[in-house]
């Protein structure tokens, strides 16, 4: 978002194929996370794109340790394959990557690419989202 009506974004959040949504449950962490992120993105005046991150100090849920999120490209596709022109506007496809506290702190001090490289080095998949996944910064030495 840079004030231009010529840019739009599509936010994706890949869930496991066996994910069970219960509309009557308040424990649908993934749904509430997405709602919180969307509310933040609508309200912010910051430029939103690859690597954009946000923090929710109280966390997104008492059931999880995730207190941040970062927007990343979808898969290992080239940038040109993650955008398209639709009715004269550029549409960018971004994926939501929930972050644990140490990952968020790492992102604050480093680039999005450096954090994504940690995921690769530690062999931790970012899609589909698994709420019990390892914290990629858990064993990173302090810099």
Which role does the model predict for each range below?
Residues 4-7, 11-143:
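Acidic, proline/glycine-rich low-complexity IDRs
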């Amino acid at each position: 978002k840079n004030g231009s009506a010529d840019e739009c974004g599509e936010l994706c959040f890949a869930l496991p194929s066996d994910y069970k949504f219960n509309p009557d449950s308040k424990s649908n962490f993934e749904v509430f996370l997405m709602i919180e992120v969307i509310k933040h993105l609508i309200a912010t005046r910051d430029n939103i794109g690859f690597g954009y991150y946000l923090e929710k100090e109280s966390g997104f849920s008492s059931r999880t340790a995730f207190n941040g999120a970062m927007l990343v490209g979808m898969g290992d596709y080239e940038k040109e394959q993650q955008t398209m022109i639709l009715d004269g506007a550029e549409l960018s496809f971004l994926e939501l990557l929930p972050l644990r506290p140490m990952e968020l702190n790492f992102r604050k001090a480093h680039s999005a690419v450096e954090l994504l490289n940690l995921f690769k080095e530690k062999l931790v998949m970012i899609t589909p989202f698994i709420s019990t996944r390892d914290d990629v910064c858990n064993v990173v030495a302090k810099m």
